Amino acid sequence: ADTLVTQGAVQSNHARQTAAAAAILGLKCHILLERRIPDKIDEYERTGNVFLDKIHGATVEFRESSIDMNAEGEAVSKQLSENGAKPYFIPGGGSNAVGALGYVSCAMELISQFDVNSIKFDCLIHATGSTGTQAGLVSGLCALSSELPVIGISVRQKRERQIDAVWKLVRETVEKLNINDIKRDKILVDDNYIGKGYAIPTDGTLEAIDLLAKTEGILLDPVYSGKAMAGLI
């Protein structure tokens, strides 16, 4: 491959990290950004991660909301290939079986640290969006025969739709781990903290961000970790 292709929301952290990785490896990078949030000012598409995408040398294109962005990425990859490039497509959030293996490793590291330090927890709580984090954690814990529940606080989709998406990726991930006894009821999703939609913080999100900043010196974001912390609280 000589070109990385990926997609995400306008201010996608994953897209920015992909652009940086491409720069390090001497690869070209083509990013598709979805306008998920209505009524944003023009600066929203020129600043922050979009600016950093371009600083890293990525080609950036925008798409309107409510289209299949992974299908769009595949189509762009095909077009680049027809023009002589050798593209490698990475789904949004890096959420495929290969990407989920990163959070399989995370699950293993967590359990190792729990054992070494004799720590016990009732559950893991995190923000669930493009599904890679939750699928990787659930698959990794299953590989370790751990019964520790993983609760995903949805930042975008309703519960059943998110469970379907996570379960699809779990099945693809455990296949790589040669596991075949995982059950769908391991996928736990709470959709009570989405509010008005993706990247639109609720009052609870803002309160959680304020609380952590003032009591722990930890900065959360209004898209993912702020909603997850609101769910934990």
Residue ranges and their predicted role:
Residues 1-233:
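PLP-dependent amino-acid enzyme catalytic core
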